Each structure stands twice: as C-alpha cells, then as structure tokens.
Amino acid sequence: MASTAKTLQAIKFDKENISLQILDQLLLPYTTHYLDIKTIEDAFSAIRLMQVRGAPAIAIVGAFAVVVDTNASLKNGGNKTVSKLFDSIDYLETSRPTAVNLANALNDIKKLVSAKFGQNDLVDEDVYQIIYKYSVALYEDDLANNFKIGANGLNYIVETLKKDGFKGAFSIVTICNTGSLATSGHGTALGIIRSTYDKLKKSESSEEFWLDHVYPCETRPYNQGAKLTTYELHYEQIPFTLICDNMVSSLVNTLSSNKNIQDNAAAPVKFIIVGADRVVKNGDTANKIGTFQLSTIANFFNSNKLSGSANKIKFIVAAPRTTIDLNTATGDEIVIEERPANELTTLKGPVLREDGSIGDKYTVGIATPGISVWNPAFDVTPHALIDAIVTEEEKVYTKNSHGEFELSK
C-alpha cells in the first residue's frame, strides 16, 4: 500500500484499540486538533458541521464510525438488533445528501450484513467483523486509488501538452480542497497536482514543459481553498498563489497575455482540475459551488473567440469510481444540499495578534442582518463542459464522437 508519510493525515483509525480520530478542519490552518469520534452521532455531527469534509473522507469516517459504535455496543452487552443498527446507519447517511460516497459505503455495509443476518438478529462479533473488514478495505483501497488517480492524471497532462506542442512553464487552477484532508491520503484533484509537480517541476522535468505554479480558489463561503488547500500546498512546498473565486477569468487572461502575476512567471493556465462529490451516468458532475463557472471560463478560452495554443485549457474532473453514480441519469436528478444562511453572512476565525500569536475565535458579520440568502453547497457542471474524467482506472474517460461520456464501459 502507498505511503502517506509525506502528506497530512486527516483520518486516524487505530486497529488495535478500535478508535477513530479526525483532524478538525474547522480549526485549520491555525490550530491542529484531532477530534475523537466514538459514536455514530459523533460522526453525524462532525460530517454535518464539516469538521470533516470531502466525499471520500466522509465515506471513510462514516464507515469507521459504524465500526467504533458497534464495537462499543458489544463491549456494553450487545443487545442491539440489526434493524436498530440499520436505523442508525440510515440516520448517518442524511448528514450530507449530495456526496454519493457516503451513501454507497453505508449501503454496502447494510447489504453485506443483510446477506447473512436478519433484521431481528442481534448484532454480534460476526456482524462486527463484516463491518470492520469492509471499512478497513475501504480506507486502504481509497488510498491506493488516489495514487493511481494522480499517476493517470499526470499521464493525461503530459500527453495533452505533447499533443498541443506546448513548451515552457504552465499553471493549474483548482477549487475547494481535494487533497489528503478530503480523502484517506494524497487526494484526487490535488493528488494529480501533487503527482504532476513531483515529476514536472522545473528541476525534475524530463519534458520540454514544467508545472510552475498552482492557483487555488478561495472557495466561498466556507473557504476550503483558502484554509485547507493552501495549508496542504504550503506543507508540501508546492508553489502557489491564493486567488478569490471571481478572479479566475482575469488570471487566465493575464497569464495568457504573457504578463506576470506578482513575481510569478507568466505561465499560462493549461488545466483546471476539480474533484467531485457525484458524477452521474452522462458525466454531469456535482462539486463545490463555483465549479460550474470554472468550466464556463475554460470553455470560453477554448472557443474561437481567442486564438493560440496557450489559451487552450482542459477542464478535468478527478474522482474515484466510487463517486460515479450510474443509477442517476443526469445532473438534473442530483439533490443539492443547501447550507445555513449564516455561513454566507458571517466569517469565523481567530484573532491574529500583532505579535503573531493566535487569540480567541470569533464570528463576525459581513452582511445586512435579516436579508434573504441562497447558499447551495454544490453546483452541477454539465458534461458538455468537461474534457476528461480521471479515475483510478488506467483509461481516462473522454467524450466520444457524439460528445458523450461512456462511464458504464
């Protein structure tokens, strides 16, 4: 299994003591604190409050929460029925409805248990072992698959740049957080960026091009890009510059015009790489709000309105196969979670003292009180605006001659 020694660890599961801890992402980047998850209720709260987030990560936390909850129940007498266990699992599934990974993992657990036990059977050691083995495999498979996604994305980037005859420095734009903090390790979209920088940074690249810079979007209103992606990029010393979500068009145009951004090289944006919370059968993709507009920006610069190979941008979705939902035909059928209004009208963070120390955390209002607010957590990018879907499979999914993805093949 691939190592996570060089990357952050958002999920800690102790196989010997059967304990689960998660890195509280609401406290990052100023405070690193691990939160104990002892029950399914703890997991529901952590997922709902977004103390853990990212489709693969919440699925893993959800599964491990069922493990620790079941283990504790057995130690306390073990009088819970399979039916009661399933009720708790169904409740946990409602914590984040848009991300398909959580639902898939919890439904897999129910199917495996139902294959051998009835609803009225007591949850015993055999039931526990089914849940335990599945959850450990889910974690280990996700980690291995993330490294495959990174390698496959790197290969696609190299092939694309060679095909375009591109030479020199290039940049990548991403949104939200899709790295070690959103998965078991390495990441999906950020995993591709990690793998690409490892092989294509200027000092290492054997090609005629190199990855010079990454531009993570702030990702309002929860600021996962500002808080989490910058935390990971800084941790691994990958050169980056944070931008607001509404700066991308200007950024791309400026770099494509061979102009510098601050002291950064005028390296054109060649790829926008995003993760996914759900990819449906036709390739429509639900991801963090703001993703759709990034695809329209890429589409504009790829149009005939602008010329020159430096202006061509590939829009890539990176996700494990577990994120692909073949039971849903189009993005119109995806349930989009809506978050509380106060997440948009307030900001939370610690006081930064003049001496550099960290003070108390406060919530500060930034909008007129009592106003109407619409705060969807996700949007849906139409498959027509997506160039490639990269999974752990060696085949990178691109559209056929009819402009359609064939994800079921």
Swiss-Prot record:
It is an enzyme of class 5 (isomerase). Transmembrane segments: none annotated. GO terms for cellular component: cytoplasm; nucleus. Coiled coil: none annotated. The active site is at D277 (proton donor). HAMAP family: Salvage_MtnA. Catalyzes the interconversion of methylthioribose-1-phosphate (MTR-1-P) into methylthioribulose-1-phosphate (MTRu-1-P). Belongs to the eIF-2B alpha/beta/delta subunits family. MtnA subfamily. PANTHER family: METHYLTHIORIBOSE-1-PHOSPHATE ISOMERASE. This is Methylthioribose-1-phosphate isomerase. It comes from Scheffersomyces stipitis (strain ATCC 58785 / CBS 6054 / NBRC 10063 / NRRL Y-11545) (Yeast). The gene is MRI1.
